[in-house]
Regions:
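N-terminal accessory/interface modules of nucleic-acid-binding and processing proteins
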Residues: 2-358
Length: 358
């Protein structure tokens, strides 16, 4: 039996950028849409589908354009809490469309509580959160049977404003993510990978996660034209690794070309983008050849992108815990020496040489 694995050729794909022609066709996010649950899900999916159809990948933020500052995850400007799931894509999308700098957002009330206000005429951006309810008939059934009632999940909308849309806010509302020098990125990723304890094998010319063997294969850094594509690729495969049954327990049984395979690839793609943004690495499209499959998936299931983004956030948080758990930060001088020496490999633990999975 062929060893089950999630694998792909290492193809250096160019990052999808926000082209001016695509921007002209994009629809600016707005909170003024009908308030049914079905409409909310479908409007989010339709927006992302339009992005993909126009060659714009929503999780590839144009970090180097216009007023964009540094790479980062959207956060609440009052609490500092990071937004998650589909809200990351919605807020990245709105920031790109409106040319906002930074990553901090507030509700209308939070802006007032901080001593400021939203400027007159500004339009908010729709964000969502999950809630549940119980049907009256289900409440009655549960009461009669003594069982817990079955709760139905749904999305509820709320409106956020970027701090650039506000006036009179304290400086704390404009906090920016710590900028990570490029020389620090590779050592930090290396430390995260090492802390994860993943079995990472540096060999061959393909990158994949072998499900049955629970190991990752990544080619040597020298095989990448852009050295930053090595950590991007490693984090993508580590995202697959996070879904193993004894970790986050996602269904990794999909065969290449199947819908289940496309779903998992979308989760890993989003998870890697979220982790890259947290680590100061500009996300890129690692799987441009899967975009067609993702569009088909979203057309078939309007909940697919929301579910994938939710699973991706869980995976990203799982991986970022290895970065947060006291992982030492390398000295900048040491980091430069690490890059200069090409010491992205080996990464421990390593088992080499490794046979290529069939």
């Amino acid at each position: 039996m062929r060893q089950a694995c999630l694998r792909r050729p290492v193809v250096e794909t160019l990052a999808m950028t926000y082209r001016s022609s695509a921007l002209k066709r994009r629809v600016c996010p707005s909170s003024k849409t009908p308030d049914s649950r079905a409409t909310l899900q479908s409007s989010i999916t339709e927006r992302i589908l339009r992005e993909l159809e126009h060659g714009v990948v929503p999780w590839v933020r144009p970090w180097g354009s216009g007023t964009a500052t540094s790479v980062g995850i959207p956060r609440n400007g009052a609490s500092g809490r990071a937004y998650s799931g589909i809200n990351i894509l919605l807020l990245w999308n709105a920031a790109a469309w409106n040319g906002f700098g930074g990553h901090n957002w507030l509700t209308f009330r939070q802006a007032l509580e901080l001593g400021g206000h939203v400027r007159r005429g500004e339009n908010g951006t729709t964000a969502v959160y999950a809630d549940t309810f119980v049907l009256e008939a289900e409440k009655l059934r549960a009461a009669q049977s003594g069982e817990e009632p079955h709760r139905i999940g749904f999305l509820k909308r709320f409106t956020l404003f970027h701090v650039d849309q506000c006036e009179g806010l304290p400086d704390t509302a404009f906090t920016k993510p710590m900028h990570l020098e490029e020389a620090m990125i590779a050592p930090r990723v290396k430390a995260l990978l090492s802390a994860s304890g993943a079995d990472i094998r540096i060999t061959g010319d393909q990158a994949y996660y072998a499900v049955n063997g629970d190991f990752i294969v990544v080619p040597p850094v020298q095989m990448f034209h852009d050295p930053n594509n090595w950590p991007r690729t490693a984090l993508h495969e580590l995202s697959h690794w996070s879904g193993a049954k004894h970790r986050l327990n996602r269904d990794l049984s999909g065969k290449f070309g199947s819908e289940l395979y496309a779903r998992e690839e979308l989760v890993a793609e989003l998870s890697a983008a979220f982790v890259c943004a947290e680590l100061g690495i500009v996300p890129t499209v690692r799987h441009a050849d899967y975009i067609g499959a993702w569009m088909g998936l979203l057309r078939k299931d309007e909940r697919a992108i929301i579910k994938a983004a939710s699973l991706a956030s869980k995976a990203a948080n799982f991986l970022m815990d290895f970065d947060r758990q006291g992982t030492p930060r390398p000295d900048p001088q040491d980091a430069e020496q690490t890059l200069a020496s090409g010491a992205l490999t080996p990464i421990t633990p390593i088992l080499v040489p490794a046979a290529r999975a069939a």
